[in-house]
């Protein structure tokens, strides 16, 4: 005779089954806006999805359970937030207000880290994507109101909430607030402040034309089954007892994209669609030891990315601001050597592959990059500053992070900026 199950065991087994069913339902449902490109789906039918292994599920669970400080401005206290907590509160409140959440996903570098932490890239921001319908302005406003209201729940005990308004919370804890509403893109982003750069970014997506630059950052991990398991089961997860968690590659073929991540390969689709920041990510990957796939037309890829960079950031002030923000986010603190190497690589790529600018505009940008590179070089200490040089990049574009430097001549910084078109006398 089989031993009878206790009530707790029955609930736990049901939780695992429900979690698995939830993952299957979300993964097999028709993709909401912002999913893989239809061209990728037709090229790789069914291959854009894959189940996570037990070690990957463990890493995901640990990442969602790790408290992240949300730093307040002025006298506002620091909030300690577990990602799974804020996801559950935001999701349940949106559902109560009548806005259905199709799925919640972990996206970007954090998802890549869960799948393969040995890539060397690590992660900064925690990108959490809520698939919702944003058909009206009221839906956009609701997502913002819900996120701001949920911050009240995470205020430390003893803090008076009586006079705290949503506007006050936005000024105190929101790093960035973005709304995009066009024919092809309907989404909003709320980024919560963290002084170390590990911002919690809540993105509400109805439709978006492209959510990745290269195959290695195209991963999304569907969190619904894991979150449901945590709510329903009192038994800790184990290799023999855990929910099915599904990953998706917006690039197309999940297995191929994961192999690119493991072997440090740079690959993409439709490079003409990559936004301006893709150029900086490309140079970052080269410095980290990634290589373009052998079949890649590197010159064409670089020309596309340079052109898009100058379309998205047309003037020198925007270029400086974009470069400084990217470098601070990815090469902060004591990583001056790699920051310098990234700027050297960017200088080379812009010099070789920019075809859309007049000569003086191109020279201005190169001077800006050179000035930032020399600043990063000086931060490495007297030995590096005395050498005042950098090792030239190899044929693969990689610049070693080292103080054995080699100088290349650069144009002196221009004292004056010129308009795009010089006046005709």
From Swiss-Prot:
* Annotated effect of mutating residue 109 to A: Loss of polyadenylation activity
What class does this enzyme belong to in the EC scheme? transferase
Keyword Nucleus attached = yes
According to the UniProt record, which cysteines are disulfide-bonded? none
* Renumbered residue ranges of the record's region Disordered: 1-42
Q: Which GO terms describe its biological process?
A: mRNA stabilization; negative regulation of apoptotic process; negative regulation of cell cycle; negative regulation of cell population proliferation; positive regulation of translation
UniProt catalytic activity:
RNA(n) + ATP = RNA(n)-3'-adenine ribonucleotide + diphosphate
Tagged with keyword Cytoplasm: yes
> Which family, according to UniProt?
Belongs to the TENT family.
> What PANTHER family is this protein classified in?
PRION-LIKE- Q/N-RICH -DOMAIN-BEARING PROTEIN PROTEIN 44, TERMINAL NUCLEOTIDYLTRANSFERASE 5B
Provide the function of this protein. Catalyzes the transfer of one adenosine molecule from an ATP to an mRNA poly(A) tail bearing a 3'-OH terminal group in an ATP hydrolysis-dependent manner. May be involved in maintaining the translation efficiency of at least some genes through preventing degradation of their mRNAs. Prefers RNA molecules that are adenosine-rich close to 3'-end. In addition, may inhibit cell proliferation and cell cycle progression through ubiquitination of beta-catenin/CTNNB1.
* Protein name as annotated: Terminal nucleotidyltransferase 5B
Organism, as annotated: Homo sapiens
Gene expressing this chain = TENT5B
